[in-house]
């Protein structure tokens, strides 16, 4: 048994009165809050406001979470659909099971439609959120640590993960395939959640650095394309290490196929935007005009309400 290892938490939830608080949910919420802060900071530099981000977040985040959950359930049908699963399990989000690919897909679509509705330039919105997404994902991965899930193959490395719950072993591909499960008391596993955390944080730093360094050369939307390429590439090799149950298609795990597609789409998007993408400065001017119009209408509405209240007092 290795003397050096990463321990697993001894709890995944706690009670406050009649309420049960799950660490998985807390990690996701913290990740969302940090992402909104990063997004707001970058959006304001383009000429936007916090209120615009707040409205967009309130519309987009719930849809993205639903998309993340549904993608996970659809790609691991044995746990959620008859005859082996139970549809009620789809609602048990506190037990884990939020697939980022589903969140990215649905969240991007909803954000695009919302930006069109509000006349916000979507390309610079995508750039603004590009480094925020991997940071949120990195924080969210801590929830997998608390749930003792999404670990990798057995290892003897000094940063191997030590499980403290026999049920955690049952989440591995080894047990699903009928092979004898390793003894969780003497076996360490690759902490793939940690690998993805580090990969995502490096990616966020690179996007911010390259976005600043190449500001005069990048087209609007290319920073988001960088995110797709980076995450797709990283998830491809991480999926090779993970041993949680997954549907296999043509010898590859479902998430590996999705990661490859995301990487390829990111490459195509980067090249297309390089040739035909909009100018970030022009998009920023467009956003500034929309913001000015919104603020003017807001000021007029506030003045109307003020006069209405004043009229009531004089009666």
From Swiss-Prot:
A 1,2-diacyl-sn-glycero-3-phospho-(1'-sn-glycerol) binds at residue 141. GO terms for biological process: lipoprotein biosynthetic process. Pathway: Protein modification; lipoprotein biosynthesis (diacylglyceryl transfer). The keyword Cell membrane applies. It is an enzyme of class 2 (transferase). It is a multi-pass membrane protein. One of its GO terms (molecular function) is phosphatidylglycerol-prolipoprotein diacylglyceryl transferase activity. Its main location: membrane. One of its GO terms (cellular component) is plasma membrane. Its EC number is 2.5.1.145. HAMAP family: Lgt. Catalyzes the transfer of the diacylglyceryl group from phosphatidylglycerol to the sulfhydryl group of the N-terminal cysteine of a prolipoprotein, the first step in the formation of mature lipoproteins. This is Phosphatidylglycerol--prolipoprotein diacylglyceryl transferase. It comes from Bifidobacterium longum subsp. infantis (strain ATCC 15697 / DSM 20088 / JCM 1222 / NCTC 11817 / S12). The gene is lgt.
